[in-house]
Amino acid sequence: SCVSLFQQRYSRTSIRINRAVPHFLFVIMPSRGWVAQTLTVMEEITAYSILKELGNDALYKYIYENIAELTFDSHRITNYFPQDFQDCYERMLIAHADEGDIRNRNAIIANRIGIYLGHNSRALQIEKIGEVTSINMNGEETPTSLWRKY
């Protein structure tokens, strides 16, 4: 890890980790006093982190402007995501490049979108009302969440 590599190089190192903020504070004791250095740790890029970057406002707008029905399933979003959010989708494919073929990566991306909808349902003004079976982005019939707009 980054911390252990740093400790190997600087044996007199005090490391404090603040889990609420994504950085480490390294305090090094060289021969002439203490030096503090902050190292920012980037969040791992995943489909979920890309959705967080896209933001609730964009997804809320998408749901309310592109889905006419009061109820919809997650596949209604995931199946059109590659076309409607092409840049995000391509970044997601790259982020999960080592996780199998395109069908597997599509399943991972769709799963992360579903998780994101669940975690952010209040901000997106939707509520999960059950499960249904429908056609996914790989053309397979699979279970998915059913949502209702507020």
Question: What spans do the regions from the language model cover?
Answer:
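Cationic, low-complexity basic patches in intrinsically disordered or flexible, solvent-exposed regions
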Residues: 8-9
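Long, compositionally biased intrinsically disordered regions
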Residues: 23, 30-37
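Phospho-regulated, low-complexity intrinsically disordered regions of nuclear gene-regulatory
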Residues: 38-65, 75, 83, 87, ...
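Flexible coil/turn residues that form the inter-helical turn or adjacent wing/linker of helix-turn-helix
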Residues: 70
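The alpha-helix within a helix-turn-helix
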Residues: 78
